[in-house]
Amino acid sequence: MSVFGLVGLQDARALQRLMESNAGYAVRIQGHGVEPGAAQEALTALPPNAVAAQKRGYGLWEGNRLLAFADVIIGWPEPGTAHIGLLMADSERVGEGLGRRLHEAIVTELRGAEGLCCLRLAIVDANADVAEPFWKKMGYQPTSQVAAHRQGTVESASRIWRRKLGCGAEASAGPN
């Protein structure tokens, strides 16, 4: 049985293994496989105008094995919003609902907390065929916001998707 918990720098080795199990994702968004140190980068990288105190790593653990990971920035890019920078599940466990379970645990963790009303993420066009069906099932909808995506050898677009999280009276009304 998997357990939801925080993921920090001390867990970089477990996250690196998870990322290496998903080399296809790295190829789609940056044009090459997972680099050494990718986990450390995922655990420390911040978007513009964010500070380290806003960053949270969440995971599903089975013993010492990290089965799924999400990088969340609280209150970014504006107060009331949490941005999911990455959500990844073990490619050896496809079909077990790990991504969905991690997302549900994050929603439960964040719903009504810290004045958050919205979850936000960016889907890179080069990864959209894989990502969009999952995020639609999780209740996200595309917005009109689009930004350029340049990483490694990949030049693409990044599209912002959002879903309500619930805040105040909304939070006690249940799922959105």
Question: Each predicted region: which residue ranges?
Answer:
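Conserved active-site alpha-helix within GNAT-family acetyltransferase domains
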Residues: 100, 125-144
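Short Asp/Glu-rich motifs
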Residues: 38, 154-155
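Short hydrophobic/aromatic beta-strand or adjacent loop that forms the aromatic wall/cage
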Residues: 55, 155-161
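Acetyl-CoA-dependent GNAT
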Residues: 2, 6-92, 100-105, 109, ...
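Glycine-rich phosphate-binding loop
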Residues: 97
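A generic structural signal for beta-strand entry/edge sites
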Residues: 79-81, 118, 158
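Conserved beta-strand-loop-alpha-helix junction that forms the acyl-donor binding cleft
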Residues: 94, 120-132, 149-154
